[in-house]
Amino acid sequence: MVTYKDAGVDIYKEDKVIRALASQIKFERTDAIKPADLKGHYAGAIEFGDYYLVLCTDGVGSKMVVAEMANKFDTVPIDMIAMNVNDAICIGAEPVALVDYMAVEDITEDIASQIGKGLNDGIKESNINLIGGETASLPNMIKGVDLAGTVLAVVKKDEIVSGKEVKPGDVIVGLRSSGIHSNGLSLARKVFFDITNLDVNSKLSHGKTVAEELLTPTKIYVKPVLEMIKQVNVKGLAHITGGGFRKLKRLNKDVCYKIDELPEILPIFKEIQNLGNVADQEMFKTFNMGIGFCVIVEKEDAEKIIEIANHHNIPAFVIGKIEDSVEIGGKTKRETVLVEYNNKKMIME
């Protein structure tokens, strides 16, 4: 069975590398400008009067490789923006501005125009301003194009959503993803291009081409989630990206997140699993599996969350609940994420 590690990505090694880097960052300002206590969360924040200024930075990873193969660059900028703004809203912040960074080996005016169009589409959907950026020509360092960005967001101090209020009895509402989003592309490319020898124009069994599926842009959840925060007491917010539902542990680590009512898995994930003979657990550790964002609320508020999502043309479902502990293999587990799928119970650690 093929794994994400076989495709060159070891998420556990990445976790160790990040911890090694973070362990060396010891300096903090000694004046009144203090960072928020959000270590390990989706975004960093620093005090600014009655507000927190929130910063997120991210790129599109190897999705750009597929864009180069298909010579189609107008959707990956949307992915870059989505990866940033979707992280920012996880603490209840409203994204307001973006700066981008593009590193190129060489680039044509046509590719630049496509990227510009995608940037405009992404900032429009996110309701943010693109206020600056940097383009670096690095022919001796990289091949192709790499695109990343940093988003600034703001939130009132007393309106931050940290996830610490998540408690047993709350429910998890999952918002439908548009597809693969921007994570797991290395494994998807290995399955489609190395194992099965398809190309970007090959049709998959459900009718779409490989390029159409892999270049579908990441869903931007800014507008519906900000509306949810205004209308409902939202306890926790989680952008489901690399690592899948493990991301829920960024919220309250003292509870169990039980995912046991998943909707139908999207066709792209079935294709990857079937063609690559990928195990269920590996799929859920690598991909969003059709749920791109989670909203945790009290049970009586779930219907309103679903209503708001549907108003923004996003299907939403109650996919699980918060519990003190879960049972698996005759053992009691605490402080974990349990996914039940295909008559299996899987711990996401």
Swiss-Prot record:
Pathway: Purine metabolism; IMP biosynthesis via de novo pathway; 5-amino-1-(5-phospho-D-ribosyl)imidazole from N(2)-formyl-N(1)-(5-phospho-D-ribosyl)glycinamide: step 2/2. Its main location: cytoplasm. It comes from the Archaea. The keyword Secreted does not apply. CDD domains: PurM. GO terms for cellular component: cytosol. Its EC number is 6.3.3.1. Gene3D superfamilies: PurM-like C-terminal domain, PurM-like, N-terminal domain. Signal peptide: none annotated. Keywords: ATP-binding, Cytoplasm, Ligase, Nucleotide-binding, Purine biosynthesis. One of its GO terms (molecular function) is phosphoribosylformylglycinamidine cyclo-ligase activity. It is an enzyme of class 6 (ligase). It is found in: Cytoplasm. The keyword ATP-binding applies. It catalyses: 2-formamido-N(1)-(5-O-phospho-beta-D-ribosyl)acetamidine + ATP = 5-amino-1-(5-phospho-beta-D-ribosyl)imidazole + ADP + phosphate + H(+). It holds the Pfam family AIRS_C. NCBIfam families: purM. Belongs to the AIR synthase family. This is Phosphoribosylformylglycinamidine cyclo-ligase. It comes from Methanococcus maripaludis (strain C6 / ATCC BAA-1332). The lineage of its organism: Archaea, Methanobacteriati, Methanobacteriota, Methanomada group, Methanococci.
